C-alpha cells in the first residue's frame, strides 16, 4: 500500500469482532501486511483512562451527553497519538469501533441528536472516515447470550443496559448500512467463527485490492 488504509469494525454487543480480529492477524502478517490494531475507547494511555470512566459499572448516573463527549475526547487523542501516524507510515489500521459507534449508541441508542454527533465526529477527526467498515450483524438476544456465557469477559456498564437500548443500537447500525453502503459491508456474525473469519478476510482483501 502506498498510503495507509483505515478499517473499522462495528457491531452490537456480542458480535465477536475481537475474536475475528485475533484470527485475522496471522493471515495479514503472513501476507506481509504492516498492520496496527487498536480499539475505542482506549488505544492510548489517556484513552484507556477515559475508557475506565465510561465503562465502570458503578457509573450508573452518567448522563448521555457526558458519555458522548467522553467518547469524542478519547477518539481525538487516539487519532492524534496513534492512528494518524500509522496511516501516514502507510500501515493498515484496524480499529475495533470508531465514528459509527457514536451514531449507533449515543444517537439511536440514547436518542441524542444525530446531526450534533456527526458534527462532533467531524470536529474530532478532521473529517477522517474509514476506507472500509465491517459491520458484524447479530440478533441482539444472541449477542447478549454470548456475553453471558463468556465467563472470561469482564462485565461493563453497557452490558447492564436493558434490551431496548441494544435493539435501538442494532437498528442504528442497519440505518447506517442503508445510508453508507458504499463504505459499510455487512457480515453475518451469527455463523460459526471460522466462516465469519473467512468472509471477513475476503471482504477485507478485496477492499484493499490485495489477492487472498
Swiss-Prot record:
GO annotation terms (biological process): dTDP biosynthetic process; dTTP biosynthetic process; dUDP biosynthetic process
Enzyme's top EC category: transferase
GO cellular component: cytoplasm; cytosol
Domain of life: Bacteria
Reactions accelerated catalytically: dTMP + ATP = dTDP + ADP
Annotated residues for binding of ATP: 11-18
EC number: 2.7.4.9
Keyword ATP-binding set for record: yes
Gene3D superfamilies: P-loop containing nucleotide triphosphate hydrolases (3.40.50.300)
InterPro entries: P-loop_NTPase, Thymidylate_kin-like_dom, Thymidylate_kin_CS, Thymidylate_kinase
GO molecular function: ATP binding; dTMP kinase activity
Entry keyword set: ATP-binding, Kinase, Nucleotide biosynthesis, Nucleotide-binding, Transferase
HAMAP family xref list: Thymidylate_kinase
Alphabetical list of PANTHER family matching this protein: THYMIDYLATE KINASE (PTHR10344), UMP-CMP KINASE 2, MITOCHONDRIAL (PTHR10344:SF4)
Protein family (similarity comment): Belongs to the thymidylate kinase family.
Protein function: Phosphorylation of dTMP to form dTDP in both de novo and salvage pathways of dTTP synthesis.
Protein name, per record: Thymidylate kinase
Naturally occurring in which organism (per UniProt): Streptococcus pneumoniae (strain ATCC BAA-255 / R6)
Gene: tmk
Amino acid at each position: 500500500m502506498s498510503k495507509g488504509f483505515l478499517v473499522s469494525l462495528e457491531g452490537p454487543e456480542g458480535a465477536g469482532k475481537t475474536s475475528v480480529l485475533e484470527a485475522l492477524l496471522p493471515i495479514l502478517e503472513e501476507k506481509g501486511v504492516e498492520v496496527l490494531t487498536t480499539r475505542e475507547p482506549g488505544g492510548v494511555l489517556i484513552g484507556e483512562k477515559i475508557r475506565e470512566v465510561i465503562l465502570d459499572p458503578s457509573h450508573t448516573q452518567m448522563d448521555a451527553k457526558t458519555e458522548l463527549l467522553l467518547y469524542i475526547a478519547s477518539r481525538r487523542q487516539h487519532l492524534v497519538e496513534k492512528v494518524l501516524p500509522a496511516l501516514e507510515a502507510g500501515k493498515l489500521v484496524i480499529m475495533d469501533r470508531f465514528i459509527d459507534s457514536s451514531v449507533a449508541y449515543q444517537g439511536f441508542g440514547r436518542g441524542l441528536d444525530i446531526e450534533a454527533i456527526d458534527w462532533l465526529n467531524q470536529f474530532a477527526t478532521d473529517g477522517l472516515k474509514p476506507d472500509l467498515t465491517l459491520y458484524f450483524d447479530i440478533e441482539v438476544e444472541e449477542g447478549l447470550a454470548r456475553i453471558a456465557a463468556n465467563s472470561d469477559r469482564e462485565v461493563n456498564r453497557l452490558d447492564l443496559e436493558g434490551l431496548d437500548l441494544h435493539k435501538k443500537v442494532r437498528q442504528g447500525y442497519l440505518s447506517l448500512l442503508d445510508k453508507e453502503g458504499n463504505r459499510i459491508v455487512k457480515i453475518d456474525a451469527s455463523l460459526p467463527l471460522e466462516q465469519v473469519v473467512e468472509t471477513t478476510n475476503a471482504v477485507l482483501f478485496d477492499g484493499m485490492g490485495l489477492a487472498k
